[in-house]
Swiss-Prot record:
Annotated protein name in UniProt: Small ribosomal subunit protein uS11
Single annotated GO MF: rRNA binding
Gene that this polypeptide is encoded by: rpsK
UniProt signal peptide: none
One GO cellular component term: ribonucleoprotein complex
Description of how the protein assembles with itself and partners: Part of the 30S ribosomal subunit. Interacts with proteins S7 and S18. Binds to IF-3.
InterPro entries: Ribosomal_uS11, Ribosomal_uS11_bac-type, Ribosomal_uS11_CS, Ribosomal_uS11_sf
Classification of source organism: Bacteria, Bacillati, Bacillota, Bacilli, Lactobacillales
Keywords on record: Ribonucleoprotein, Ribosomal protein, RNA-binding, rRNA-binding
Entry similarity comment: Belongs to the universal ribosomal protein uS11 family.
Disulfides per UniProt: none
Length: 130
């Protein structure tokens, strides 16, 4: 019997970046927060689903707030101080995620809405009748 091979896992290298971009992608079902450096390389990320929220709880503003806090803390551990915010999507967690980023101590320099708007593209889903 052969001994089990130990696989060497790569240790995550802590980057030291002072300014970056916080991408908040807020959908109807989830909120993802990714903080990158200015070139677009990922520094930290979090989402409502990754924090343990399941089902319809993922789409709440509170879940978005927690996701933004987790991503911001991880980014601040790597030296992040200033951040530009770009928000994409129609979800409920847009504003609460921005407020949460500001509350953790990151200085927000600009807020951009980069929600894609179709020039009469595909047909939208039918209205829900509940």
């Amino acid at each position: 019997m052969m001994p089990a091979k130990k696989t060497a896992r790569k240790r995550r290298v802590k980057k030291h970046v002072e300014s970056g971009v916080a991408h908040i992608h807020s959908t109807f079902n989830n909120t993802l927060v990714m903080i990158t450096d200015v070139q677009g390389n990922a520094v930290a990320w979090s989402s409502a689903g990754a924090l343990g929220f399941k089902g319809s709880r993922k789409s709440t503003p509170f879940a978005a707030q927690m996701a933004a806090e987790a991503a911001a803390k991880s980014a601040m551990d790597q030296g992040m101080k200033h951040v530009e915010v770009s928000v994409k999507g129609p979800g409920a967690g847009r504003e609460s995620a921005i407020r949460s980023l500001q509350a953790t101590g990151l200085e927000i320099t600009a807020i951009r809405d980069v929600t894609p708007v179709p020039h009469n593209g595909s047909r939208p889903p039918k209205r829900r009748r509940v």
